[in-house]
Amino acid sequence: METVRRIVKGTLLLGFCTGIGGDLWVLVAPGQERRLEMRMNYPEANPPMLAEAHKRNEMVLKVIEESAKTNENMARRSPWSS
């Protein structure tokens, strides 16, 4: 009987804590308007920043392809900025 009481007590405590966590999540989470505003500020929504990210990714892929073709350690090449 003691085991059943412990299981029920533990289950109720777990459910209570989960309920409090869910309520706090709802209180802290941003509203619909705030989520839309945040979505507009993503880099993907800004064309100049998106173009810059594409350019940076192309440069990284170029270096990776170049390093795959040679046995040289690209990390030790100087200068790094070129």
Swiss-Prot record:
Topological domain spans for side Mitochondrial matrix: 1-6
Single GO BP term: cristae formation
Main location: mitochondrion
Keywords: ATP synthesis, Membrane, Mitochondrion, Mitochondrion inner membrane, Transmembrane, Transmembrane helix
Transmembrane segments annotated in the record for this chain: 7-29
GO cellular component, one term: mitochondrial inner membrane
InterPro entries documented for this protein: UQCC3
Any Pfam family hit: UQCC3
Quaternary structure, from the entry: Associates with the ubiquinol-cytochrome c reductase complex (mitochondrial respiratory chain complex III or cytochrome b-c1 complex).
Record family assignment: Belongs to the UQCC3 family.
Function: Required for the assembly of the ubiquinol-cytochrome c reductase complex (mitochondrial respiratory chain complex III or cytochrome b-c1 complex), mediating cytochrome b recruitment and probably stabilization within the complex. Thereby, plays an important role in ATP production by mitochondria. Cardiolipin-binding protein, it may also control the cardiolipin composition of mitochondria membranes and their morphology.
PANTHER family: UBIQUINOL-CYTOCHROME-C REDUCTASE COMPLEX ASSEMBLY FACTOR 3
Name of the protein described by the UniProt record: Ubiquinol-cytochrome-c reductase complex assembly factor 3
The organism of origin for this protein: Xenopus laevis (African clawed frog)
